[in-house]
């Protein structure tokens, strides 16, 4: 008789994935990133253990969006009265693509400590250069 075996946090093997965002559709790319961060692509996926991999996104400022999503607004609140600030997706992509990717990916991960730990494994860079070449070569 076979039993399903749950993986323990110290048994998880993490890989580094480099994803080039140039010319790719934003939403489809973010779902792929969320799957890798969560670890659902692995046969030993366990929901209560962070078994995901590290993801490095390069050329984040050259990602493509379809339809009229360029005008989609992201809202945040400063904490003061009347302190609602809004930014359009196009502005956010030019100014701070890391924030754009983290906001979109965060919505696809669990809203718990586990989700925050998974999001820390996402590294986003607007250009093609990144400081993680040593880790990526090790895979």
UniProtKB/Swiss-Prot annotation:
Biological processes annotated in GO? negative regulation of translation; translation
Molecular-function annotations in GO? mRNA binding; structural constituent of ribosome
Name the source's superkingdom. Answer: Bacteria
- Alphabetically list the UniProt keywords: Ribonucleoprotein, Ribosomal protein
The positions making up the signal sequence are: none
Coiled-coil-forming residues are: none
Q: Can you supply one Gene Ontology CC term for this chain's record?
A: cytosolic large ribosomal subunit
What does the UniProt record say this protein does?
This protein is one of the early assembly proteins of the 50S ribosomal subunit, although it is not seen to bind rRNA by itself. It is important during the early stages of 50S assembly.
User: Which NCBIfam families does the UniProt record give?
Assistant: rplM_bact (TIGR01066)
Q: Subunit notes for this chain?
A: Part of the 50S ribosomal subunit.
Q: What is this protein called?
A: Large ribosomal subunit protein uL13
């Amino acid at each position: 008789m076979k039993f399903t075996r749950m993986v323990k946090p110290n048994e998880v093997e993490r890989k580094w994935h480099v994803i080039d965002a140039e010319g790719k559709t934003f939403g489809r790319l973010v779902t792929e990133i969320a799957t890798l961060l969560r670890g659902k692509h692995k046969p030993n996926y366990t929901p209560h253990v962070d078994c995901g991999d590290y993801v490095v996104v390069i050329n984040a400022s050259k990602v493509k969006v379809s339809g009229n999503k360029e005008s989609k607004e992201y809202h945040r609140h400063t904490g003061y009265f009347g302190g609602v600030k809004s930014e359009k997706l196009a502005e956010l992509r030019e100014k701070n693509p890391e924030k754009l990717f983290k906001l979109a990916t965060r919505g696809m991960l669990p809203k718990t400590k586990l989700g925050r730990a998974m999001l820390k494994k996402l590294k986003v860079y607007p250009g093609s250069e990144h400081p993680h070449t040593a880790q990526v070569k090790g895979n």
